[in-house]
Amino acid sequence: MAIGMSELKKGLKIELGGVPYRIVEYQHVKPGKGAAFVRAKIKSFLDGKVIEKTFHAGDKCEEPNLVEKTMQYLYHDGDTYQFMDIESYEQIALNDSQVGEASKWMLDGMQVQVLLHNDKAISVDVPQVVALKIVETAPNFKGDTSSASKKPATLETGAVVQVPFHVLEGEIIKVNTETEEYLEKVK
């Protein structure tokens, strides 16, 4: 199905030259003279590169053949990550470039969304909020009560986030995976 210029918006998935992209940012421009156009920044699902593209009135782009599947992350083995389709129990192996930044939030057994383009896995999305255990952080000292103060904490997946001083090693916290920020302790 063709997508017209007027339908473009942030987050929309499009295909140009056989490559699937996500619109990261767009701006509708209406110059004093001439026809309106859309200037957009689009990110490739295949290599992660962001390019700027201008769409003119009448331009069309295709809707990509993308399928999102819920899969279970099994384990990491060298340079591959093993996933299992929770419906068919079929296993697939993805490399570092396919998994990307999601790897620092993934725990064995976690359910993730794997994006497939023409039946080939191209990216992995983790939940926006995950609960992870702190394996290393500096101890608290008396007087560390300033609410704005933060300290680095290493999580069980190896990711490092800034946490308030009252958070201790061994505690489980919720983290926003998009902003990489501490949200709260898990009770």
Swiss-Prot record:
Kindly give the NCBIfam families that the UniProt entry links to this protein.
Answer: efp (TIGR00038), PRK00529.1 (NF001810)
One Pfam family for this entry, by name? Elong-fact-P_C
Q: Could you list this entry's UniProt keywords, alphabetically sorted.
A: Cytoplasm, Elongation factor, Protein biosynthesis
Cite a GO CC annotation.
cytoplasm
Q: Which organism is it from?
A: Helicobacter pylori (strain G27)
What molecular function terms (GO) are annotated for this protein?
A: translation elongation factor activity
Which family does the record claim for this protein?
Belongs to the elongation factor P family.
Query: What gene name is given for the protein in this entry?
Result: efp
Q: Which HAMAP family match?
A: EF_P
Gene3D superfamilies named in the record = 2.30.30.30, Nucleic acid-binding proteins (2.40.50.140)
Q: Which InterPro entries match?
A: Elong-fact-P_C (IPR015365), NA-bd_OB-fold (IPR012340), Rib_uL2_dom2 (IPR014722), Transl_elong_fac_P/YeiP (IPR020599), Transl_elong_KOW-like (IPR013185), Transl_elong_P/YeiP_cen (IPR001059), Transl_elong_P/YeiP_CS (IPR013852), Transl_elongation_fac_P (IPR011768)
Protein name per UniProt: Elongation factor P
User: What Gene Ontology terms for biological process does this UniProt record contain?
Assistant: peptide biosynthetic process
Described function: Involved in peptide bond synthesis. Stimulates efficient translation and peptide-bond synthesis on native or reconstituted 70S ribosomes in vitro. Probably functions indirectly by altering the affinity of the ribosome for aminoacyl-tRNA, thus increasing their reactivity as acceptors for peptidyl transferase.
